[in-house]
Amino acid sequence: KRLFKYKIHSFRRSLRLMRKNILKKKFKEGTPIINGWLQIPNSFSAEVMAQQGWDSLTIDMQHGVIDYPNALQMLQAISTTETVPLARVNWNEPGQIMKILDAGCYGIICPMVSNRKEAEKFVQACLYPPKGYRSFGPIRGLIYGGQDYGSHANDEILKLAMIETSEALKNLDEIMSTPNLDGIYIGPADLSLAIGQKPGFDNPKGSKTHTEILNILKHAKKHKLFAGIHNASPEYAQEMINLGFNFVTVGSDQRHMSSEAKSVIEKMKGSKKGQDIKGY
């Protein structure tokens, strides 16, 4: 058996078959995906996070302090593990989407998708023709993904559109019926602002934001899409899983570091001596 497995492994290596996106496998199996969030522009901190066992890690290029050279090194660090590398781009801009995919990113979270046209623009930027208009040049994607990357990338790349604007709430079915869209991702802070509420995470039951979250989830389930959401705490993330979300982000590298440092200071100097946790 060992010899057979070795031969199969050697055969796959010789062919360089494209690395599978295990997030899609988990979705089909009904297994919740626990996603980490990176805002610090450092490959070592990304490697430390990746070693903790997250199913995926998202490099935040929208609100994190991360540019492309940072992101490339962080992708290299994440690839030392089985954690799936994702990125949230700073806007629905094809050039940036294609470039970070070329660097070996296995999925894109796109902010502020408000209608069908914007959803199609986003999805098609992630796909090679004839399904999309992505330009071919996966300079690191070939190294990380495999030599047959071009033949299978359309099937493996994860595409999540963020639902967080008042216009998007009016166009949920149009957005979610976009061909080849894999799922949606809720940004609770911007969603709260869009409906006249204070921005924040872990919105309580009965709040306007929580009601809208349930409505978005219902539509995602109807269209059989990934349903993702950003959370501040593991307890709230578990509540979201119990409701039916299958992709949950819990905090961020910056927030985890702040929280642990605050805890240490409070224990050493007395309660409430640490700074309130900032960021998300």
Q: Where are the regions that the model predicts?
A:
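Short, Lys/Arg-enriched N-terminal segments with co-localized hydrophobic residues
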Residues: 1-17
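Expand to "…catalyze enediolate/carbanion chemistry for C-C bond making/breaking, isomerization
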Residues: 15-280
